[in-house]
């Protein structure tokens, strides 16, 4: 049974919010696409089994990679526009358009992927509790979110452009983010949800804003700085967790 909703999420308002974020298209171009693909590259080291649930599909870039490794792919997203896009591009995928808080799959999955999803939800622990119930006994959860201690956020605070490292920027708000986690607060959510953390880390050493990166960085530079973040996870732009029961 799915845990009872303990948050003030109003379904109609939340669905409208998700559609507005999807219509903006902020994740469909530039370095945002690069970072989501790099997340999938990292997750690929740990995901397992033949079935996968992708919680939050974005524009389908991660879905495409999942189809290379899994026979049974299910995607759930609250945005009708994004769900229809993925269903149209990948006819072999089971696509569900619903809020996580209201869904009951009636089955479990070997791997569950939340690629830059948890920063959007109202209650991160509640959603992880749902994911735990939907995870097979030997399964794995792979999740990533932006890191509040990113080098570029620390620089923004020193320059007076951001009041605190975990403050929401205009880009965060535009993308529908509700929080910016530290590595510690992100890991704490998994522990509170009753999950076991097998590995955590970071990627993308990010000295500049997304707009500056899109303007000045070559693909080779993006690749290098994504990888450098794995060497310096505490100040990387993205933080991730690999968790099990």
Where are these regions (language model features)?
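Conserved N-terminal segment of class I S-adenosyl-L-methionine
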Residues: 1-107, 111-115, 128, 202-205, ...
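Short catalytic micro-motifs in class I SAM-dependent methyltransferases
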Residues: 116-120
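A generic structural signal for alpha->beta connector loops
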Residues: 70-72, 92, 138, 194-197
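N-terminal hydrophobic or amphipathic segments with adjacent small-residue motifs
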Residues: 43, 50-52, 132, 138, ...
């Amino acid at each position: 049974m799915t845990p009872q909703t303990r948050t003030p999420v109003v379904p109609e308002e939340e669905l409208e919010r998700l559609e507005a974020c999807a219509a903006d298209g902020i994740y469909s171009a530039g370095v945002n696409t690069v970072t989501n693909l790099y997340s999938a590259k990292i997750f690929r080291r740990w995901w397992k089994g033949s079935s996968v649930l992708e919680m939050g599909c974005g524009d389908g870039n991660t879905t495409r990679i999942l189809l290379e490794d899994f026979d049974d792919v299910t995607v759930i997203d609250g945005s009708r526009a994004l769900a229809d896009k993925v269903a149209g591009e990948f006819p072999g995928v089971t696509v569900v358009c619903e809020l996580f808080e209201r869904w009951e799959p009636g089955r479990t999955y070997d791997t569950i992927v939340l690629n830059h999803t948890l920063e959007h939800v109202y209650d991160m622990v509640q959603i992880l509790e749902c994911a735990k119930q939907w995870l097979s006994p030997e399964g794995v959860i792979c999740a990533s979110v932006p890191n509040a201690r990113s080098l570029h956020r620390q620089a923004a605070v020193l320059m007076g452009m951001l009041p605190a490292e975990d403050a929401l920027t205009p880009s965060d708000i535009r993308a529908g983010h509700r929080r910016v986690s530290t590595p510690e607060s992100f890991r704490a959510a998994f522990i509170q949800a009753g999950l076991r953390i097998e590995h955590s880390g970071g990627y993308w050493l990010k000295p500049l804003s997304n707009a500056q990166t899109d303007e000045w960085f070559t693909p080779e530079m993006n690749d290098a700085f994504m990888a450098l973040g794995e060497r310096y996870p505490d100040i990387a732009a993205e933080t991730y967790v690999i968790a099990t029961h």
